[in-house]
């Protein structure tokens, strides 16, 4: 069997048709990784650091090639694709220093002489299941910390990003068995979850729940990032023009295909009317690339049609664009009734609803009403209001006077509720996730 990816801007353009690994091939990849892991860990901090440093250099040298491939395979705008390639380089360099970081602590004994140590050790083989929307950065931010602390890894990318994953692994050029890509779909993903020693997953809520259940049954660590319905709050004292710029970028950037994209805009009091006009104007003029496929396009147009039937007003976009690709004009809707899927679900496209709120309390209640919240933004000139909102919002990541998108790679990444499960990704949190703590007690022999 093969797995194929197509250019979202020109669906007739077949990017790759790769042989799938199958269950047996995935199992074999895990076995090779398990055989390579003791040597990779025992090679020491200097060897692992140097390998990740060389990988960063290789990705940097091929950055333009990788960006062009991301444009072609997943429809990412060139500027964003270049930024993603640069981010992958920065992540590799950041984690190249991690092997030298302290891996434990020394503690005092409760009584008498002795030495108490805590040490962190790798789990073994990390199973990495990644989505298509960040085909360079997400595989790197999962693999780099896992490898830095001495795990080996098997990567199962989304079918739509197969070519990016395979080329990325070639460039990293790690020793045999240290990082293996297994092309495929559900079969390969399920086998990897069933055989790896630790699993990191980013993808849909439905699949993520199955991954969580499978890993819980095996008693192995898992982290799952499942996206969410992200809200932006705009207060009456905000710079409306600046807020509209940020919101348009967070709704329409990369066609809204980011876990941190804004899906719900909540305008407080007098901010509603000027924001409605400013944001509709920007989204109408926004240049927006294609969505990932025909099914995604159908889901977006169906959501707009359903909302309008239910009484919503379409303020911008909401239609398929002309041309051969899977283009969708960024949509803004008002008067979407409570309970409509656009107010409860993530649609993973350039579509947002505009909601009024009488005051900050109501705005926060609306933002926190969803069962999954990854990111939120607050737009205000008042520091006290910003800090109060940040303290009360349920989102895992909160940005003040900034888009919900664009979080920093060296900070913990994750949401709340059903948006995430397990320990955070990125930064030092990832190093803890990919290791287990062990306590060592040394007492005098006599």
Mark where each language-model region is.
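Short, well-ordered beta-strand elements within core beta-sheets of diverse protein domains
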Residues: 15-21, 36-42, 128, 232-235, ...
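N-terminal Rossmann-like NAD(P)+-binding subdomain of aldehyde/semialdehyde dehydrogenases
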Residues: 1-114, 285-288
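Conserved C-terminal structural/oligomerization subdomain of aldehyde/semialdehyde dehydrogenase
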Residues: 13-17, 233, 320, 327-446
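Structural signal for hydrophobic packing residues in well-ordered secondary-structure cores
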Residues: 37, 41, 56-63, 67, ...
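Residue-level signal for inorganic ion chemistry
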Residues: 11-12, 33, 48, 70, ...
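ALDH superfamily catalytic-core signature
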Residues: 206-337, 400
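Rossmann-like NAD(P) dinucleotide-binding subdomain of oxidoreductase/dehydrogenase enzymes
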Residues: 104-242, 273, 357
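Short, solvent-exposed loop/turn elements at beta->coil junctions and helix N-caps
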Residues: 54, 113-115, 317-323, 403
